[in-house]
Amino acid sequence: DEETFQDVKNILVPIPACLMGLARLDMPSIVITGGVMDAGPDLLTLEQIGMYSAMCQRGEITDEKLTYYKHHACPSCGACSFMGTASTMQIMAEALGLMLPGSALMPATCEDLKEMAYKAGKQVMELVKKGIKVSDIVTEKAFENAIMVHAAISGSTNSLLHIPAMAHE
């Protein structure tokens, strides 16, 4: 409705854009993401495909092995399962206080994600009752917290562009 905002985002650009939009709207808001993709066999991720492509070009692995890696690097729905921009920004949203604790990196295929979405809905209604808006949550202290968390997780450098843009809002 027009009194609350819940949004589901899961790739690198929409998350910062969503957070900036929430800052502009300045209304009771909670973000819930669609979760993180499962890792492939032997913890294979999309991030490794470039390395395997180079290995194939050098003759270190076969075309068949490269094709196998390409077909198994993204075994489920969800954000990339490495510490790229999407995962970093999901963690930043949680560190800023716009996601429920523990929700930033939940697996997309986890049944608990539905429960977290339900809790997010209940929480946003509590924010409405209490009149708590984004500007009440995302304070200078919240940004300091997010920056410390970013350093602790060795987050994506792209987020170092997104965080000041969000603060500007």
Language model regions located:
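Flexible, glycine-rich loop/tail regions that form catalytic "lids" or insertion modules at the edges
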Residues: 147-149
